[in-house]
Amino acid sequence: MSDIFEPTEHPHRRYNPLIDQWVLVSPHRAKRPWQGQQEKVNEEQKPSYDPTCYLCPSNKRITGELNPDYRKPYVFKNDFSALLEDTPVPEKSSDPLFQSSQARGESRVICFSPDHSKTLPLLTALEIEEVIKVWQEQLRELGAKYQWVQIFENKGTAMGCSNPHPHGQIWANSFLPNEVAREDRTQRDYLLKHGSVMLVDYVKRELELKERIVVETEHWVALVPYWAVWPFETLLLPKTHVKRLTELSNEQSKDLAVILKKLTTKYDNLFETSFPYSMGFHAAPFNGEDNEHWQLHAHFYPPLLRSATVRKFMVGYEMLGESQRDLTAEQAAERLRALSEVHYKERTK
């Protein structure tokens, strides 16, 4: 083996300053044969309306309630909410090994469109703008009552999505979840140490280097982070300091719709399939502090590795030691960057 380090050939670790953890990169493993589980792919064209779908307009939900005949994004209280608005406070324990705390909150569902067949990349930028407006409205409403509001989407059965109608979720809670609390601490520490905002500095460096950028628009950039864990993981960030979705200008909001369409289209084009992922926004909490250390960003965590049927599993060493990836972040970005911004289903034959 060569004594000269080559990042595309040699195992190495990369540091994620946002969560204060390391990831093991093993590029030499990318060529290993695969005889393990393969995902089932259903490429049947979905109808624009499904009479059996609990989320389509005018249909009856599992609870018996009727959906309105909605024509734009529609929000309703989750029928199987993970959080409740009024829960009693657990009795305080003196035993340090058995601690609990109160968890209050609300869980809501947002149907992106009345069309059962249209995921985000198949919506127009104008239709995605409508989704963003609803996200912002929900943040304003729920942020007045709870310190954390999590906007997210689980897309595809591979990510545990229980209903094929394109939708996301909005959970608001009275506490800072673990991942958010960790990002809050690391960004605060960075500001105290360096006098600048971590992810603003990071965007500037990535825009200079270019090698991990996937999509760039006037106000936004989507990139494969240097410390990515999932094969085609991306981080979506504004180019300037913005703490929350509710603080975006009209131009930034419109441009967010553009880059969301472009990024998710590239994802679908990679293996010409409806690309599964979990995505969500992280932003400054609604805790009454100035939160100048925070920078708005969205994480996209897609599981697919080699094809539409082969996914990455977080098991073994990754559960017991630390996260590990084969493909380098630069290689993943290069593949995504080279893809068309026209969806494979919309190309002229």
Residue ranges and their predicted role:
Residues 1-165, 171-243, 251, 265, ...:
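Active-site microenvironments that recognize anionic phosphate/pyrophosphate groups
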Residues 255-274, 278:
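Extended C-terminal subregions enriched in glycine
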Residues 243-252, 256-261:
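A contiguous, surface-exposed recognition patch within enzymatic or periplasmic domains that forms
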Residues 279-283:
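Acidic/histidine-rich, metal-coordinating catalytic segments
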